[in-house]
Amino acid sequence: MEGYIGNKNFVDMEAMRYWQFPLNYKKDKKQETYDLIFSGRYVGALKRDGYYQRVIKDDDGNIFMVARDKNVKGEPVDKHEWVPQLRNWFESLPNGTCLIGEIYLPNDEGSRKITSLLGCLKEKCIARQQEQNKFLHFYVFDVCAWKGENYMSKPIEDRIRVLNKINNSIYGNYPYVDFATYYEGAELWDKISEYLAKGLEGVVITRKDCPIYEKRTPARMTIKIKKELSNTIDCFFTGRASAPTKAYTGKQVEEWMYWEDARTGEKFNERLWKKYDEGTTSLMPITKNYYYGWAGSLE
């Protein structure tokens, strides 16, 4: 049947919607985001300022490119013929494929520009791209199915491995198609700073055990970090940070969890007050930022 891979209709499925901090969120978004990124439990990739699309090549070889939202009749709208520059890539994909991505214009990003183009009649959309010499690109950032195997219940770590294999094969060697690169930890933090400093849309971070949900994901399984957060995540824009203070001088030292052996440099994440108080070791309490190698202050 059209749109089906195995027993699932990937054309008519509900798109995954990514969680982001509510506007009235009371806690410190910057610190929470920082803590999550350095927890070792998240990966993240660039978010293009484009328009969500799923590319499907079903079990019978039928090709579709459908958006997140459906038309007024509640039907998915196929737009794959609006981007003939992607035709060779579409046709090369194996049957049983569903890739998630964004249609975007390089160096001229903006979702409104994309909806304006794809909202035209097919011939007009193609003509406008040719006249302006600006051709829509497809940015792949996730995989629902590949060669008939359904990956929706697999964690993002597994899906990234599949994406990398696709990207490193002939399917990643087509013009107008590019694949997301995922980062984690300090490298992800630096990339967020770099992307937002360049005026790009932002980043989506995803917990490593996150499958593909239909509709909205649970809180903090995915988090959109966008340029609109510049007032609260200001460090993403400068990328500058001072070195962290080493010695902890707070009042909770008896319960403190971050310590270093001043002689060997070995760090410990446990309560060591009693040993410290005995005065027979070279232990010293250190700040949480120093323990994790985080910035002392963010500019």
Predicted feature locations:
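Nucleic-acid 5′ end/cap handling module spanning
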Residues: 2-11, 16-70, 146, 164-299
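Covalent nucleotidyltransferase
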Residues: 34-171
